[in-house]
Amino acid sequence: MSNQDSWEDFCEQSELLPGEFLVREAGGAFVAVYNIDGLLYGVEDVCTHDGGELAGGPIEGFSIECLRHGAKFDLRTGAALCAPAHAPVPIWAVRVTQGKVQVRPR
């Protein structure tokens, strides 16, 4: 079985209400899962500009801003939306199964 097929338990669904996020270690990386209006999005918790954490940065629509230097990323695709970041942030697949939020690398 490849890593792409391996889902990991991340949290209970009840721990991640709309407007909230959680950061946990999964698959050897720190992953942030965001609940935006009931939809879940997962990204590695690292700015590709300088390696800082993304979690806790302001969210507007589907974009998150790094608090360190203002780089923005699309939570749906991982795309860098503005300088100083140019490389996308790795995204993680997220699903809910039997009340558990699960993640895996894409």
How should each PLM-predicted stretch be described?
Residues 1-61, 75, 88-106:
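N-terminal pre-ligand scaffold of iron-sulfur
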Residues 72:
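Short helix-to-coil "ATP-lid" hinge immediately C-terminal to the conserved N-box Asn in the Bergerat
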Residues 61-67, 80-89:
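Short cysteine/histidine-rich metal-coordination sites, predominantly Zn2+-binding motifs
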Residues 47, 66-69:
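Short cysteine clusters
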